[in-house]
Amino acid sequence: MQGRLDQSILNLPGVELARRNLEAALLLLKALMEQGLSQAVLCPGSRSGALALALGVLEPRGLALYTAIDERSAAFFALGLARATGKAVAVVTTSGTAVANLLPAAVEADYGAIPLLLISADRPTRLKGCGANQTVNQESFLAASVRWFGQGDGTGLAAMTDAAIDALARQAWSGTRPPDLAPGPVHLNLSFAEPLHAGGQALLEATAHASLDTTSSPWGELGLRTPGSGNQAPPFSPAPDPDQPGV
């Protein structure tokens, strides 16, 4: 596939693949900000962990970030922001039925000619059609209402080259205002392979890879210790493993 890194990227040790997931998420969101994205609404979830962490890194760098528990409410909140500003606002969700909850706002954005950027995390293609938890055909959920639909590599966003990620982000942003149609919603569906969460040194390296100023990384705001600051215990250690399918 054009724009794919060597397949061995997905066979990296866990920490390195988690770092690449975060790098890819940062590169995508940074490219969207360069196109004009200035506001995003985040809904909590495990599969979208890299996107959530990337949004947190970018918040002090010019991105207004809001959080919401309910995806339907989040999408309508973003719709209101987009209507007020005339610029697309991003809504970021996890996989599964979370995506279905975006449909009402997508319909409103479609008929109201309001630009809206709906970004959903997804499981890799290999987990589709085999009974994996929270795995559905979310690619088609919003198809009837969006101006444009795009996907990352089916094996995982981490498998795409930096240039391909940048191009995908630019396509998504331009899709909110197509030259031959009224403005409207777009759906960007992104697969992420486990492990999903990077922290510590991996976070610092991913931030540097995305050409972001690492001296102002909001470590405290993200609940992480600064790399090299000592062997401090993490703020919490949940019992379930968030990097495993089905969580």
Regions found by a protein language model. Give the residues of each.
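N-terminal alpha/beta PP-like core and its mobile active-site loop of ThDP/TPP-dependent enzymes
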Residues: 2-247
